[in-house]
Amino acid sequence: MSAETGELIWRDRADSHPSATITGAPALNGNILYVPVSSLEVALAVNPAYECCTGRGSVVAYDTRSGDRLWQTFTIPDAPTLQSVNAAGTNMYGPSGSMVWNSPTIDHTRNQLFIGTGENMSSPADHSSDAIFAIDLTTGKVNWIYQALANDAWNTACGTNTPQSCPEEDGPDFDFGAGTLMVKTDSGRQLVVAGQKSGIVHALEPKTGKLVWKNRVGRGGIQGGVHFGMAAGNGKIYVPISDGPDGREYDTPDRPGLHALNADTGEILWYSPAPNVCAGRDFCDPGVSQAISVISGKVFAGAMDGVMRAHDADTGKVIYQIDTTKPFTSISGEMATGGSFGGGSGAVAKNGLVVISSGYGIYAHMPGNMLMMLSVE
């Protein structure tokens, strides 16, 4: 659309599958727009009569001037085929899934982009799920794939009273929901860093996809672990961990809060545990699910308890916090209330101001609807 008038210039449906959607922000590189494709089909499998699943993740490249589609690269090269019939007599298709929930990261040096993928949605699980892809910017050719976790096939039928379409692998649903980071370490090395819902952070060599280091930072879970986005700066990787309750039992302890890692080695430099201030409130949990931001030496981390905390980037100490679940008088004179911080958009800074958005009333979190502007002074 025209930024000045709103006039439509061109439009295109990125994927023809009826459940396809776009959850990650597209990435712009010159006159080419790279659009990640995900899907809501994972939720339909709870119905035993639904033929699960036929959607695949992809990236679509567009010429921004004309809207011409330059290429589309699927995370699963071949369309799903009939695999079995479930206990309800419904056809089951696969491999499927490996959706791209996050925004592509551009690697100008090597003319490629990076994406992370989700789980397979039906059996059989394949090599494309819970993986990092490097894709050529010009041709869409896959340069390499790093799979962090094999045999992860899961959908919303799993763990319900209608499990007929749950894949035989049955999870654990440890996507890469958060976007990757291109990081330059203190030693001058470039790394691709990715945080997973398992709570593990992976650092890869960008040319080959070879693992350089990995570290378990959180317990992990269906909503993380690392859910929506990390940040980096001054040789550190800042990792938000949610580790909220999800009905499962785990061998590792919960570590909700904010962690700082040495980008060269993956060593944990500091950990700021998330305080539990929920006091029994419904849908309130400690932990950080929302994407975080590094602004002027501070790490802004909005938590699931509705509190935005600014941490000292060197020490992790909380130097400012504001509870957005309390009522505020808006500029229109109406009362506004926030809720849990969630989703892929963290704090945004401009001209000495920080903009935050509070309220995330899905997946058993606190609803709210408030846009707030803060001063960084």
Description of each model-found segment:
Residues 25:
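Long, structured ligand/cofactor-binding scaffold of large enzymes
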